[in-house]
Amino acid sequence: MIQLTRFTPSEVEALGRDRNFLRDQSEWLCPSCGEVSVRTYLRNTKHANRPAVISYTWCAACRKMSGSTGPLPPGLTISDPWRELDPAAWEQFDTSLPRLFARLDRLWEDGVLPQSVVWTR
């Protein structure tokens, strides 16, 4: 399985500057390799007993990634077709990052992802 490396801080900044994932969930340009292969997956969770969201952004071409956890913004609704498709695998999602991203890539290539995101304020 291919190991992933992290986007550099300047690449993460470029990802945030060049894209608004909440408006468009399609793949976009990777600041590292130049391929249109950057994908994002959001997962609802709880952190300190409060609603939270885990965000993973990765490039399917050069295998760079970034992840973060933060509070779930009020009014943000995230569909999670993976959870509906395979609840057992979804529960074990973070046991191995290489397996996680391989699984997310398969779901993307099979048309299960990207997710839909609705933000009502």
Locations of regions flagged by a protein language model:
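Short, flexible, mixed-charge glycine/proline-rich loop motifs
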Residues: 16-27, 47-53
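Short cysteine-rich clusters marking metal-coordination/redox-active sites
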Residues: 30-33, 59
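Short, intrinsically disordered terminal segments enriched in charged and Pro/Gly residues
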Residues: 1-24, 70-121
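Cysteine-rich micro-motifs
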Residues: 51-66
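N-terminal single-stranded DNA-binding subdomain of primase/primase-helicase replication proteins
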Residues: 33-37, 44
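Short, non-ligating residues that shape and space the ligands of small metal-coordination modules
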Residues: 39-40, 68-69
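Short linear interaction motifs
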Residues: 11, 40-42
